[in-house]
């Protein structure tokens, strides 16, 4: 049980992806994921998009709350040097192209000012 989450970071015309599977998700999980990203003090035309793949309503609410928490606490900052090419890091560690899934649901999008 659970669902898949995809995060996309667009920067300078390039896109980076992170995909992971969650069963029980809370704010600290998202904070842990974002902690590895380098945080800058200025916006540089970047966008962070978070997608939920699946329809597990029990997981949707805490993920949205976590994303809003990150947005509120990091307003005016942006993430850089997250990943350097278009890949998905699967649970097995294999690199694959990001999936094209029209049923993906956009949960939150943080756009630089």
UniProtKB/Swiss-Prot annotation:
<protein>
    <recommendedName>
        <fullName>Non-structural protein 1</fullName>
    </recommendedName>
</protein>
<keyword id="KW-0922">Interferon antiviral system evasion</keyword>
<keyword id="KW-1045">Host mitochondrion</keyword>
<dbReference type="GO" id="GO:0052170">
    <property type="term" value="P:symbiont-mediated suppression of host innate immune response"/>
</dbReference>
<keyword id="KW-1035">Host cytoplasm</keyword>
<keyword id="KW-0945">Host-virus interaction</keyword>
<dbReference type="GO" id="GO:0033650">
    <property type="term" value="C:host cell mitochondrion"/>
</dbReference>
<keyword id="KW-0899">Viral immunoevasion</keyword>
<comment type="function">
    <text>May play a minor role in antagonizing the type I IFN-mediated antiviral response. Additionally, NS1 may serve some inhibitory role in viral transcription and RNA replication.</text>
</comment>
<keyword id="KW-1090">Inhibition of host innate immune response by virus</keyword>
<comment type="similarity">
    <text>Belongs to the pneumovirus non-structural protein 1 family.</text>
</comment>
């Amino acid at each position: 049980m659970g669902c898949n989450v995809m995060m996309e970071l667009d920067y300078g015309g390039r896109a980076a992806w992170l995909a992971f599977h969650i069963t029980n998700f809370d704010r600290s999980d998202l904070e842990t994921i974002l902690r590895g990203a380098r945080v800058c003090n200025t916006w540089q035309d970047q966008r962070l998009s978070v997608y939920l793949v699946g329809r597990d309503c029990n997981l949707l609410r805490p993920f949205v709350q976590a994303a809003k928490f990150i947005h509120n606490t990091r307003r005016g900052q942006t993430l850089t040097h997250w990943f350097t090419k278009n890949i998905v890091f699967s649970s097995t560690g294999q690199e694959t192209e990001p999936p094209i899934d029209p049923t993906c649901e956009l949960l939150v999008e943080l756009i630089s000012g």
